[in-house]
Amino acid sequence: VNLATDVRWGRTEETYGEDPYLSACMGVNFVRSFEEMGVITTPKHFAANSGDGGRDSNPIHFTERFLEETHLVPFKACFQKGQSQSVMTAYNMLDGTPCTANPWLLIDKLRNEWGFDGFTIADADAVGIIHKLHHTVNNFSEAGADAINGGLDVIFQTTYDEHRPFLQACLDGLVKEEALDRAVGQVLKAKFRLGLFEHPYIDENEAEKWNA
């Protein structure tokens, strides 16, 4: 539900256009239909995502008022009207803080102000990008700690081996215990809401039919 604010942005075709109201209406109707069927939806990319000149993932400097009147409108609607239970963070920075580790965005705005009670998930490799692209931390362990402490619940990396530097952040005590409890709790809460623990075992024949 990102806005197409610059036609030079290479992901413009993924959006509903440049109008916050239209994007909100389309987004709400899309996510609500799935949520009502018991499928968790994850609006993305929270928030803004495209910088000056359509530069994807680049730093963005918008005022809070501008964000409230434009880029945040579709997201707020998806959570409050569409009942989306998850949200994916954006690659970019907002005023010097990566969206994936941004407590103003993920805690103050999303949870405290809007009342969001789902889980937050990073885009693919977005936590690693905190270190590799934005250089706001010294290493991957610090990136993981900044993200979880800043309101992220799920780290999404593209290979299993990439979990190791983020695990080290927990082992070294860089991740606050209450932040870790929140992250784990939000994911478990979503699973309980879906009834996954009521039926913990899948039908192997059914799974084979869909995954063959």
Which sequence ranges carry the predicted segments?
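Glycoside hydrolase catalytic-domain context in secreted enzymes
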Residues: 1-212
